[in-house]
Amino acid sequence: MTTPTSILILAAGQGTRMRSSLPKVLQPLAGRPLLSHVLDTARSLDPHRLVVVYGHGGDRVREAFPEDDIRWVHQAEQRGTGHAVQVALPETDADDRVLILYGDVPLVRGETVRRLLAQLDEGGDLVILTAALKSPTGYGRILRDDSGRVQRIVEEKDASDSERRVNEVNTGIMAARASDFTRWLSKVTNDNAQGEFYLTDCVALANTEGRRVEAVVGHEAIELMGVNDKRQLAEQERAYQRREAERLMVQGVTVIDPARLDVRGEVEAGRDVSLDINVILQGSVKLGEGAKVGAGCVIIDSEIGPGAHILPHTVIEGAVIGAGASVGPFARIRPGTHTDSNAKIGNFVEVKNARVGEGSKINHLSYVGDSELGRDVNIGAGTITCNYDGANKHKTIIGDRAFIGSNTALVAPLTVGEGATIGAGTTLNKDAPPGELTVARAKAITIPGWKRPVKKPKE
């Protein structure tokens, strides 16, 4: 039987180097708070207990994560990582495996920490996660004896010159039994340069007891690095986006430039999808096989059908785009929109909460809102559905094969029948019968001899 795992996430730091009123763990990475990414990793391990230690910006942090699987522990005074773990341990059972994660280390992978827990199960009493860095400045150093065994961790402020030359660093992530952490932390003092209770002192205490201290070296240094300022936040953002681009490319997606793709949610993509530069995919996005997304497009919580073509600089939110449809360039598709197969929405068109039938076209310079269009409808340039009367929204229904002339205003609620034609320049405020031409247009008048006004001479 597997020993239950409790995961403690330390998220109480103030993050002064961020120079922000937003608590550090709420800073956005790929459109979500740093802490959200760590919680995803923690939940992938199916923990017995999930405990978050919070402090700075307490209520804001808790309100951002209302999920009921989190146990919140308040660290009123930030007295170091050892103290943070100490206040959280009462939420665990004595025999639990306890894994320590950090709210500002967002890219750690589930498989990496599984290696840590496996080492604990194989006989380690304390297992720490380390990284080898070319530039280890700012991190605690891992000190080993001549046989390679970990002896202790020294924080940079307390390290000698020779110790600072060590490039294997502590990530802070570690695992041990709850009862062992409780015993070791009861012996930790704050006799150090920062006057804090260091969690890392557990390494030396475990060695003093003759316990087995193991180190697992992370494969990818960036996933183990913390975020302390906006520069590091930007570095982590790029690392996350590289990871997402690689994941998509492995699945058969063509990413024109992996450095210019932003994924801010969950993306499912079929084979032979193509993503041009500066595309942003946000929320839950599904891209059907062979779909093409042009440069500068933003797609939010939407589904793009197989073979659909989204032309450059189009924004799509909360919509379903049918197979083979074409949208853009410079189109805006708002929530509630559903286009059927082979529909076409062209440049400078806005569509909101509308159904656009198979093969229908809204080619340019139009607004279609709260509407239902049948098959093979043609909407001329400059057509506006007048859906709002100042208090309520009203629906426009346009039947199959209807033709709406340019510069037409459709004052909802109304229905345009199948095969009807609406003459250009019409303001339509009543239903139009099927198969007939309906026109509402003032007669053109020519005024003989009319002259333009002459400007008065300047005084």
Curated annotation (Swiss-Prot):
Location in or out of the cell: Cytoplasm
GO biological process, one term: regulation of cell shape
Manner of cofactor binding, per the entry note: Binds 1 Mg(2+) ion per subunit.
Positions of Mg(2+) binding: D104, N228
Positions of region (N-acetyltransferase): 252-459
InterPro entries, per database record: Bifunctional_GlmU, GlmU-like, GlmU_C_LbH, Hexapep, MobA-like_NTP_Trfase, Nucleotide-diphossugar_trans, Trimer_LpxA-like_sf
Main subcellular localisation: cytoplasm
The entry's keywords: Acyltransferase, Cell shape, Cell wall biogenesis/degradation, Cytoplasm, Magnesium, Metal-binding, Multifunctional enzyme, Nucleotidyltransferase, Peptidoglycan synthesis, Repeat, Transferase
CC cofactor: Mg(2+)
Reactions listed under catalytic activity: alpha-D-glucosamine 1-phosphate + acetyl-CoA = N-acetyl-alpha-D-glucosamine 1-phosphate + CoA + H(+); N-acetyl-alpha-D-glucosamine 1-phosphate + UTP + H(+) = UDP-N-acetyl-alpha-D-glucosamine + diphosphate
Enzyme Commission no: 2.7.7.23, 2.3.1.157
Free-text function comment from the UniProt entry: Catalyzes the last two sequential reactions in the de novo biosynthetic pathway for UDP-N-acetylglucosamine (UDP-GlcNAc). The C-terminal domain catalyzes the transfer of acetyl group from acetyl coenzyme A to glucosamine-1-phosphate (GlcN-1-P) to produce N-acetylglucosamine-1-phosphate (GlcNAc-1-P), which is converted into UDP-GlcNAc by the transfer of uridine 5-monophosphate (from uridine 5-triphosphate), a reaction catalyzed by the N-terminal domain.
Name of the protein: Bifunctional protein GlmU
Species, as recorded: Thioalkalivibrio sulfidiphilus (strain HL-EbGR7)
Lineage: Bacteria, Pseudomonadati, Pseudomonadota, Gammaproteobacteria, Chromatiales
Gene, per the UniProt record: glmU
